[in-house]
């Protein structure tokens, strides 16, 4: 008499809930998206309604190079997080520092543009409606880039001290979510201000 074999149905794979850090960052991104939406709508609403100049067409130059720098930083931080998850800490640190460099170049480009607009064209936040909405929208984004760079720099300091390992890969992934958000917002700002707005 042969022993009967019992077959069991395939059990569904366990469903892992996202970490609290990812949930919190997702909530922050949703809230920040609402704020940026208000600023973008305000920019579009007041576009072309300035009584006095200068106008966007007269003074704005398309920051293609600095845009490429910022968008490229999304790739570098993505691969940096992947390297850390695989315990390739040397590559992680190199890509992380490259991300900071690219973000810093973008901020430099923003500062350079503001200097030109203020001192060559006399455009300040109180000059006209365009100045008010332009500096508010672009400044809001620059503030978020600055905040992101500060957080990236803190991680870099710990990384150079040898205190970042695969154990922190989850936190690094959460931080990369914020940086991807900042880059995605710039695509919208760039399109509205430098393409549609001109």
Show the residue positions of the predicted features.
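...captures the hydrophobic TM-helix bundle architecture rather than a specific catalytic motif
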Residues: 1-198
């Amino acid at each position: 008499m042969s022993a009967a074999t019992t077959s069991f149905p395939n059990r569904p794979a366990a469903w892992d809930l996202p970490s609290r850090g990812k949930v919190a960052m997702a909530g922050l991104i949703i809230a920040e998206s609402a704020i940026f939406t208000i600023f973008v709508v305000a920019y579009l609403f007041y576009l072309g309604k300035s009584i006095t100049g200068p106008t966007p067409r007269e003074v704005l130059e398309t920051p293609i190079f600095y845009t490429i720098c910022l968008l490229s930083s999304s790739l570098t931080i993505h691969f940096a997080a992947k390297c850390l998850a695989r315990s390739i800490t040397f590559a992680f640190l190199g890509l992380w520092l490259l991300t900071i460099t690219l973000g810093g170049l973008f901020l430099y480009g923003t500062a350079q543009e503001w200097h030109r607009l203020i001192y060559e064209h006399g455009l300040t936040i109180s000059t006209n409606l365009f100045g008010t909405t332009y500096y508010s929208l672009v400044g809001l984004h620059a503030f978020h880039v600055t905040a992101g760079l500060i957080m990236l720099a803190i991680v870099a300091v710990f990384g150079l001290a040898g205190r970042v390992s695969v154990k922190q890969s989850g936190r690094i992934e959460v931080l990369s979510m914020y940086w991807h958000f900042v880059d995605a917002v710039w695509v919208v700002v760039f399109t509205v201000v430098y393409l549609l707005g001109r």
